[in-house]
Amino acid sequence: MSKSETYRIEVEAVAEYVEAQSNPEDDHYVFAYNITIRNTGTVAARLVSRHWVITDGTGHVQEVHGQGVVGEQPLLAPGESFRYTSGSVLETAVGTMHGSYQMEASDGHRFDAPIPAFMLAMPRVLH
């Protein structure tokens, strides 16, 4: 069995604009994102840390590194999923996020699980 089949984590992200917490007049745009992390490999793996690359509409890039997610380092058995919600604040009405989770398999192997890029956008801004 190849390493790509053994150590496989799929990440899905869905973002939404949080109008109630945003203030466009002050360039304060709040977005929530829902993440689903699914272990589609053949060994258990723990999410150890995260790395986000957040780019706003002007091209300004912010990188975020941290341990776990929402205060947890979930252990995912093969076939298991973990879901969480978090947020990001931008100074522009649009932006993108992508990154990776650093995982540690039950056999000690460490690997990165890529987080595909997703859009942060205030409704009716993009055509």
Swiss-Prot record:
HAMAP family: ApaG. It comes from the Bacteria. SUPFAM superfamilies: ApaG-like (SSF110069). PROSITE patterns: APAG. Residues 3-127 form the ApaG domain. Signal peptide: none annotated. This is Protein ApaG.
